[in-house]
Structures are given as structure tokens and as C-alpha cells.
Design a protein with these regions (language model features):
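Compact, charge-rich alpha-helical regulatory domains located at protein termini
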Residues: 1-48, 54-60, 64-88
Length: 88
């Protein structure tokens, strides 16, 4: 497992970044959804500890949303929600 200092929120990652999910840490994401609901949705999409991720594409305006390859699936995700996914 990566040290805490080595972890970066997926929401800050740039195109072609690759890493492994270390944990989901939902804090204040400025969302209308509760932290529990955001965490549940991320897990349902496959964002679980140990999963390999790669940022494939960034949106044109504000680099949002991002397209992320998670295992064998491609998922579009807002950077705001991706901030809860810590990768290393």
C-alpha cells in the first residue's frame, strides 16, 4: 500500500495518469448527494480498493468530465466526485 504522502485524488490526475485505488475518502465535495450516496455510487461503478485506473480523456472545458478506464470498463466521471478516489 502506498504511503499517505504518495496518494493523490483521482480528480487532480491528468490524461494518461495510471495508478491503483488505495481508498475512497468522501469528504466535502460540494455535492447535493450525501457522502454515503457518493461512496455507494462509486463502488457500484467499480471504484474499489486495489482496482487499476487510467485517465483516458479530459473534457474540453475545465478538463471536466474525465474518462477513466477502471479494470476493463470506461467510465465518465466528474472531477468533483473523482476527488474522493485516492490513488497511488
Amino acid at each position: 500500500m502506498a504511503a499517505a504522502g504518495d496518494l493523490v485524488p483521482l480528480g487532480l490526475a491528468r490524461r494518461n495518469f495510471a495508478g491503483r485505488i488505495q481508498r475512497i475518502e468522501v469528504t466535502d465535495l460540494n455535492s447535493s448527494l450525501s457522502p454515503e450516496e457518493i461512496e455507494r455510487r462509486l463502488i457500484e461503478l467499480g471504484f474499489v480498493e486495489g482496482a487499476e485506473v487510467r485517465v483516458l480523456h479530459e473534457g474540453l472545458f475545465g478538463r471536466d468530465p474525465i474518462a477513466v478506464r477502471i479494470n476493463d470498463a470506461t467510465v465518465a466521471l466528474r472531477r468533483r466526485e473523482a476527488m474522493a478516489i485516492l490513488v497511488g
